[in-house]
């Protein structure tokens, strides 16, 4: 095993006044999604096996996990060990990552390289009986335009948009930590067309997308229900209700929702039966549409976001859409957002330097508003703040690409508890490790 590199090799000199042991210790979320969600200012579109794949339980050593930090415009991904405060590994990908996600059971970093048609996987090193150094898995996937990575409770769908100009069709693959370890997908499906689509996995079913003959862009306009048969899928039915310009999706207990140009398509599952309704856009939604949907697998109300920085509560059970007035001043914008690891909170970093914490089960009520940035830097072209959170503690991580900082926010104390100055510009971030169910929280 390679020796662990001291964190000082990757941080600016001089260091902050605090010693390294205090700069980065216990760790503490968007996917999509559960897990990390590295979204920027503009919301853009990001199955489960028949037998659930259990979370890893082989590691008896308690660990706060590791934080994967991609260097902007470089192939490097550093894994920060959150127990020792050191760099556990500096992994070199084939190409710069366009996104980082945690795997379904949080044992691997999923490194998307969309423009190069490639996905690589980093083993966290925490799944063995004793912690090991992280390593780049020999398993990789090469398929055109990997884009959306959507987590269900036990698996993840990785959607490939394909390339219409090159005659390459779209498809999706179903992954679990077990299948990644075995260097294969659990199941897959190939379409007969290219499209910027998505797939939501519900047990042995997949709700995925299709472009009809009347679709005029790369965005789909229909939802198809598919049924898993071992390592592949068969089409069960096409949902009659259309969804022009479909973009963004999320699932709850019974409902799965998709953003459309004219509203939100909501599909309810009862046993093996699926029925749909369309919730139309409301009058306060001016010259825009919902393009991103967030929520929890344990709740059937969802948050819809638009490019014009509006937010809406989507309630399919009551066929309602209601605007959430999340900002006190019209000029306030969101810089980054995501859902925490256990899907209890929606997190939003705004342009005033505050982290808003919204309770999902209380219809996205704001329950905390934490000052995390004394001043908000101007972002250069291509730069974004990114948010992820821990699966073992109530900690949120925010990367600042301008000041090359990594902030740790404790949701219990509602304060920034660590600030790490890096020697590189951080881009995407993701937490990996052994998950721990959170204690009951109060606000």
Give, region by region, the residue ranges found by the protein language model.
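Acidic, serine/threonine- and glycine-rich low-complexity intrinsically disordered segments
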Residues: 207-341
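Bacterial signal peptide processing site
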Residues: 28-31
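C-terminal motif of bacterial Sec signal peptides marking the signal peptidase cleavage site
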Residues: 23-26
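Blade-level signature of beta-propeller repeat domains, shared across WD40, Kelch, NHL, RCC1
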Residues: 401-407, 411-443
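Post-signal peptide N-terminal segment of secreted/secretory-pathway proteins
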Residues: 72-170
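A short beta-strand motif characteristic of beta-propeller blades
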Residues: 86-92, 128-141, 145, 180-191, ...
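Long, acidic/polar, low-complexity amphipathic helices and coiled-coil-like
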Residues: 129-259
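Repeated scaffold domains used in trafficking and secretory/extracellular systems
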Residues: 53-59, 95-108, 140-154, 188-204, ...
């Amino acid at each position: 095993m390679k020796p662990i590199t001291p964190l000082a090799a990757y941080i600016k000199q001089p260091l902050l006044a605090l010693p390294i042991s205090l700069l980065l210790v216990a760790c503490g979320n968007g996917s999509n999604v559960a897990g990390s969600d590295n979204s920027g200012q503009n919301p853009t579109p990001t199955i489960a096996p028949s037998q659930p794949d259990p979370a890893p339980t082989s590691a008896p050593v308690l660990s706060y996990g590791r934080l994967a930090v991609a260097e902007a415009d470089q192939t490097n991904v550093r894994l920060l060990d959150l127990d020792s405060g050191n760099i556990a590994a500096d992994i070199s990908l084939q190409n710069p990552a366009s996104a980082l996600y945690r795997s379904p059971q949080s044992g691997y970093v999923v490194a998307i390289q969309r423009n190069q048609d490639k996905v690589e996987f980093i083993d966290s090193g925490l799944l063995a009986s004793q912690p090991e150094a992280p390593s780049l898995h020999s398993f990789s996937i090469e398929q055109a335009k990997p884009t959306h990575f959507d987590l269900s409770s036990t698996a993840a769908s990785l959607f490939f948009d394909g390339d219409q100009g090159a005659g390459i069709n779209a498809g999706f693959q179903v992954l679990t930590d077990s299948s990644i370890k075995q260097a294969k997908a659990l199941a897959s499906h190939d379409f007969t067309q290219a499209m910027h689509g998505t797939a939501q996995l519900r047990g042995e079913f997949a709700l995925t997308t299709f472009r009809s003959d009347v679709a005029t862009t790369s965005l789909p306009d229909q939802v198809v229900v598919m049924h898993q048969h071992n390592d592949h899928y068969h089409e069960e039915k096409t949902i009659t209700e259309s969804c022009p310009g479909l973009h963004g999706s999320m699932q709850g207990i019974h409902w799965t929702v998709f953003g459309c140009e004219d509203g939100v398509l909501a599909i309810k599952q009862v046993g093996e039966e699926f029925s749909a309704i369309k919730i139309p856009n409301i009058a306060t939604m001016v010259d825009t549409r919902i393009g991103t949907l967030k929520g929890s697998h344990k709740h059937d109300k969802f948050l819809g976001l638009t490019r014009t920085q509006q937010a809406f509560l989507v309630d399919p059970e009551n066929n309602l859409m209601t605007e959430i007035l999340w900002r006190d001043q019209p000029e306030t914008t969101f810089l980054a957002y995501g859902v925490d690891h256990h899907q209890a909170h929606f997190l939003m970093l705004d342009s005033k330097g505050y982290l808003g914490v919204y309770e999902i089960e209380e219809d996205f009520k704001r329950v905390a508003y934490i000052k995390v940035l004394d001043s908000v830097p101007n972002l250069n072209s291509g730069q974004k703040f990114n948010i992820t959170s821990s699966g073992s503690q109530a900690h949120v991580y925010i990367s600042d690409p301008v000041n090359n900082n990594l902030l740790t926010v404790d949701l219990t104390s509602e304060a920034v508890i660590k600030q790490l100055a890096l020697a590189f510009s951080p881009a995407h971030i993701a937490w990996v490790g052994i998950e721990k169910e959170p204690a009951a929280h109060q606000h």
